[in-house]
């Protein structure tokens, strides 16, 4: 029973890690959407710079837009994957919770004095 409890705790920790990862991805998604909105407000000839280390380097606006679009696509794919992991872990936890309840009920009905 304690082994099952430890496994259940481990699954809860894994689920929590997936949820935190999902939240980080959501933050990144929102940040990149804001950058995309900023690009929409720029004139075509407005210079765009990329921070590399401590240096701002000029980049083509089209290249910067493409990079942000690719990043958005990647983040959305990661969010989908992360959400699937969360669902799978929740299902696993629910099955284990049912097992623990059954074991608890069995132990209670066959416990001392019965």
Swiss-Prot record:
Protein location: Nucleus
Listed Gene3D superfamilies: 1.10.287.370
GO cellular component assignments: cytoplasm; nucleus; prefoldin complex
Domain of life the protein comes from: Eukaryota
CDD domains in the cross-refs: Prefoldin_6
Keywords tagged on the record: Acetylation, Chaperone, Nucleus
Pfam family, one: Prefoldin_2
BP GO annotations: chaperone-mediated protein complex assembly; positive regulation of transcription elongation by RNA polymerase II; protein folding; tubulin complex assembly
InterPro entries the UniProt entry points to: PFD_beta-like (IPR002777), Prefoldin (IPR009053)
Single GO term (MF): tubulin binding
Modified residues (N-acetylserine): 2
S-S bridge residues: none
Subunit structure: Heterohexamer of two PFD-alpha type and four PFD-beta type subunits.
PANTHER family named in the record: PREFOLDIN SUBUNIT 6
Reported function: Binds specifically to cytosolic chaperonin (c-CPN) and transfers target proteins to it. Binds to nascent polypeptide chain and promotes folding in an environment in which there are many competing pathways for nonnative proteins.
Family: Belongs to the prefoldin subunit beta family.
Anything else known: Present with 784 molecules/cell in log phase SD medium.
Protein name: Prefoldin subunit 6
Native source species: Saccharomyces cerevisiae (strain ATCC 204508 / S288c) (Baker's yeast)
Phylogenetic lineage: Eukaryota, Fungi, Dikarya, Ascomycota, Saccharomycotina
